Amino acid sequence: MKTRILRITTFTVFAAAALALGCSKRDPAPGGSAGSAAAGSAAGSAAAAKGPLKVAFAYVGPVGDAGWTFAHDKARKAVEAEFAGKVTTSFVENVPEAADAERVIRDMVAQGAGLVFGTTFGYMEPMLKVAADAKQVKFEHATGYKTAPNLRTYDSRTYEGAYMVGVIAGGMTKTNVLGVVASVPIPEVIRNINAFTLGAQSMNPAVTTRVVWVNKWFDPPKEAEGAQALLDGGADVLMQNTDSSAVLQTAEKAGKFGFGWDSDMHTFGPNAHLASAVIDWSPYYKKAVKDVLDGTWKVEQTWWGVKEHAIDVVAISDKVPGPLKDKLAQVKQGLADGSFAIWKGPVVDQDGKEVVAADKTATDDFLHGINFYVKGVQGKLPSAK
């Protein structure tokens, strides 16, 4: 991360801030809080007036979470820079994945937004409702699967980043036990746990992965508690699929290793940090805005990864040996040019059942519905949502 909106250097401060905000992807501060860029706000007439395109973003967490929402807001700023004078942007942070999301999104439309981004899975139904009543507005829903005549979906292949940091984890572990602090049991998160494990096993077949579910996207105290439980259970390298830096900070305190997730988190645990699996939403956001400005916007479902420069592993630690970095570079190149597939069979679940045959590669439809742990992941998978 080049610039931080909120820089927090100790978990104690971060946890206190989180408690004050009371926000997560499940129950952030009621109603959310609004912010706008210097280029302009969403204030305006109920219908989009002639002039710059008004682009509004609904965020599930705080822009200072150092992870998921920070990455989206960084991309929003990139849109402003790319289309200076042609667009104005605004955002509302801490918008719950609940009925209140509909109110916030309707308000964005009422204030003249011509393009609305909803940045979490739980906005799907509220966005569909608003889209049905605001046919003049284009809607973009992150991580969803339903579309409408004026609503399309987009996502990033975060499992590619998970696999790549798994390669590092498999080469760095001394105990052969890895840990993942997971948010909620939806296919996106299960994919990432499995990909992390497969990446680690590509370097060290003896590796096993233990998982703690916190059932929140952003809850630093719970994330830290889960991380400590994994460390106490023998894990010496941690990954997360949550939104704060608490997991990495916990690894730092314990003298163990961890990774940044969604954004570059190396400053939060400089000794523990091995690398960060990051998302760059700016290529897609720029495309979406350009589509609207050019009049070429159409309904489609987009899932971008390393190939499209949407996923990367950055800030690789000097502690990672050269041969391991070379292997990581090889995997990244293979993902970019299509010569390597993470989900090429045989893929076996934790019960020994072959779920992807040796001569097959899992389809995107298969990955979108994944509801099992691969061999090597310990524990029972909670009911997928």
Language-model region placement:
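A residue-level marker of the well-folded mature domains of exported/periplasmic proteins
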Residues: G31, A39-K385
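Short amphipathic alpha-helical "recognition" segments used for binding
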Residues: L6, A29-G31
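Bacterial Sec-type N-terminal signal peptides, specifically the leucine/valine-rich hydrophobic h-region
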Residues: A18-A20
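Bacterial N-terminal signal peptides that target proteins for export
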Residues: M1-T12
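Bacterial signal peptide processing site
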Residues: C23-D27
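Repetitive helical segments and hydrophobic/amphipathic motifs
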Residues: V13-A16, A34
